[in-house]
Amino acid sequence: MKKLGRKSVIRQTYESVLNSKLFDEICVITDSKLIYNHLNKINFNVLYSNTQHDCGTDRIAEMSHKFDSDIIFNIQGDEPFIDKNGLIELINVFKNDINNKIQIASLMTPILDYKEVSNPNIVKVIIDNENFAIYFSRHSIPYSQEKKISYNHFKHIGVYALRRKSLKNFSKQGKTSLESIEKIEAIRFLEMGYKIKMVKTNKTTIGIDTFEDLEKANDLLKRKII
């Protein structure tokens, strides 16, 4: 419920997604009474989950029966600067997948500052030659002894597009071992054998996980850099 500019972070995120005009329906699913009451008061579409889930994807799976779409987006509430073009690219992944082979897609952005590579609050992803995720980690992957950018490092952005079936299977599986260690929900899909198509976006984005992130985001907002 921290403020970004004059609005809460979750409200900024909701309005960014709403203003993209890409989705048939937008809904916040939360287990926080504070967030529920805040969004309900301003007439935003919000559902309350009484169940304590380990991650947002599990909450969405719980409420997925309320939505008709075969493709469901999970946009984490701490992504107020989400890139519309990145969302369009994720939609196009499924539009172009005529054989329905891709079950999950997500966003990544290049890391240009080595401090971010070594920052455990930033989730890194390594990919194969077809842009499918090999692994996600809070650690530096791949590790470089040179302590500088010597590889195309990518930061994972907290946005997923999923087919309904994969979402349900994710929830049925329950928390997996590597997911528990890293505290990264995307790893559960990998441990289940799913391939995650990663889409690159060059748009500057800040996931607000810490007070320092919030300060940086407010500064960029004031200077209208984002």
Where are these regions (language model features)?
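N-terminal glycine-rich phosphate-binding loop and ensuing alpha1 helix
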Residues: 1-30
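Short phosphate-binding loop-to-helix
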Residues: 27, 33-92
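Hydrophobic/aromatic residues located in beta-strands of well-ordered beta-sheets
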Residues: 26-28, 72, 105, 133, ...
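Short, high-confidence coil segments that cap the C-terminus of an alpha-helix
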Residues: 23, 69, 99-102, 194
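Conserved alpha/beta core of the MobA/IspD/sugar-nucleotide pyrophosphorylase nucleotidyltransferase superfamily
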Residues: 151-226
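Conserved core of the sugar-phosphate nucleotidyltransferase
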Residues: 82-173
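Short glycine-enriched, charge-decorated loop/helix-capping segments at active-site entrances
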Residues: 1-5, 47-49, 175
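A conserved hydrophobic position in a structured secondary element of the catalytic/binding core
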Residues: 30-31, 82, 162, 209
